[in-house]
Amino acid sequence: MIKEILKKADEKMGKTIVALKRELASMKAGRANPAMLDRIEAEYYGSMTPLNQLGNISIPEARVLLIQPWDKSALSAIEKAILKSDLGLNPSNDGTVIRLVIPELTEETRKNIVKTVKKTGEEAKVAIRSIRRDCNDDVKNLKKDDVSEDDIKKAEDDIQKKTDKYIKEIDSIISAKEKEILSI
């Protein structure tokens, strides 16, 4: 029973890290990254479709994203979706491809992005701690099932070690992202 709780904690905490990495990848850092477009969907034949399913997204230069739709009729829908997004990018449509030039980040913009990165990191830490609390509650409920106090204490210590490990990983991910943003 305790093993299942520890396994559940590990899985949930791991998913939190994956979600954090995905969220940070979509934040612009002054250089082109196809993950920036992951959250953007365009209306294509009546349904909202992610851009990466509408065409090939490549990086011909450090600060340029090139979107080559498989269906040229999707060009205007892709362009509208990018304009409506919160990325603040101006697509250039030449009739066959869409170019997105990523502007240089100003010092103020960098600082704002770093604030957002830190906030996202804090949210991930809160999620990890919430998972710890839930798992500790599950372990405490095992007292009713005649599990010894020593086993419960050991399980709580193991959960705390996992929590510390994942919090440390979040700190290193956030630190790396901050360096990436500030060093461009």
From Swiss-Prot:
Keyword Cytoplasm applies: yes
GO molecular function per UniProt: ribosomal large subunit binding
GO cellular component: cytoplasm
Protein localization: Cytoplasm
Protein keywords: Cytoplasm, Protein biosynthesis
Gene3D superfamilies assigned: 3.30.1360.40, Ribosome-recycling factor (1.10.132.20)
Any GO BP: translational termination
Homology family: Belongs to the RRF family.
Main function: Responsible for the release of ribosomes from messenger RNA at the termination of protein biosynthesis. May increase the efficiency of translation by recycling ribosomes from one round of translation to another.
NCBIfam families referenced in this protein's UniProt entry, alphabetically: frr
Protein name per its UniProtKB record: Ribosome-recycling factor
